[in-house]
A protein has these predicted regions:
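Cell-envelope/extracellular polymer assembly enzymes that use nucleotide-activated donors
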Residues: 4-7, 36, 191
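Conserved donor NDP-sugar-binding/catalytic core segment of glycosyltransferases
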Residues: 103-136
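A conserved acidic beta->alpha catalytic loop
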Residues: 41-50, 70, 94
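Conserved nucleotide-sugar donor-binding catalytic segment
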Residues: 123, 141-208
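Acidic helix N-cap motif at the loop->helix transition within catalytic regions
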Residues: 18-20, 46-54
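Glycine-rich, basic loop-to-helix element that forms the pyrophosphate-binding segment
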Residues: 68-85, 107
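Short aromatic/hydrophobic "clamp" motif used to bind/position activated sugar donors
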Residues: 90
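Short, acidic, metal-binding catalytic loop of nucleotide-sugar glycosyltransferases
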Residues: 24-34
Length: 208
């Protein structure tokens, strides 16, 4: 394992209007550890790649880029980015979302560092439209505490995708990710969550 603490896995397809805000929210994180940003573009046609290139040139030590030659409908783009993740912990950020707390990563990393039995930690988030108008008070329905199989069976999630920081499966000996590679067993987020739950606790923190 290298000294990268967190791999921020960014996924974009025609997100040009939102891309800078998403990346700036990652770059504004205040941390005492090293992190990397991996941006996977799924053959965008709206100028997203120009924006990505500008950030990669400006932050060459932080940002890695992966460009799909043809649109993969997410599948290969997600796979290639996750395979490139070298951090001890991993978090996804689809680039039409963004983070609002500059201490977000530090808070979640500190929690996982202090709780070795915990494999993932999430938190609530506010849902907004493309004009930043709030659509919902928060997401998900799990306010805080341990996320359990009873929640999974009801279709509830511990947090929206970009709130979930988890231990990199590459470095977790007892974590079987084979179900994640079975596309007939449900959406990718749910498959990954189910696999993570077999290897440790999933916790939702009481903040947005």
């Amino acid at each position: 394992m290298n000294d990268i603490k967190v791999s921020v896995c960014c996924f974009t397809y025609n997100h040009a209007p939102y891309l800078s805000k998403a990346l700036d929210s990652v770059l504004s994180q205040k941390t005492n550890f090293r992190y990397e940003i991996i941006i996977g573009d799924d053959c965008s046609t709206d100028g997203s790649q120009d924006i990505i290139n500008a950030y990669a040139i400006k932050f060459p030590d932080l940002i890695k880029t992966i460009y799909q030659p043809v649109n993969s409908r997410g599948k290969k783009n997600f796979s290639d980015v996750y395979k490139s993740a070298e951090g001890q912990y991993v978090i996804a950020l689809e680039t039409d979302d963004y983070w609002t707390d500059p201490n977000k990563l530090q808070i979640q990393v500190d929690y996982l560092d202090r709780h070795p039995a915990c494999i993932a930690v999430a938190h609530n988030c506010v849902v907004v439209d493309e004009h930043d108008r709030q659509l919902a008070r928060k997401y998900p329905a799990i306010d805080q505490g341990v996320y359990r199989y009873k929640h999974f069976r009801k279709g509830l999630m511990p947090g929206q995708t970009t709130t979930v920081l988890y231990r990199n499966p590459k470095f977790v000996e007892n974590l079987d990710m084979s179900l994640y590679n079975n596309p007939i067993s449900g959406p990718g987020d749910s498959r990954r969550l189910f696999c993570l739950m077999t290897a440790g606790d999933v916790i939702t923190l009481p903040y947005t």
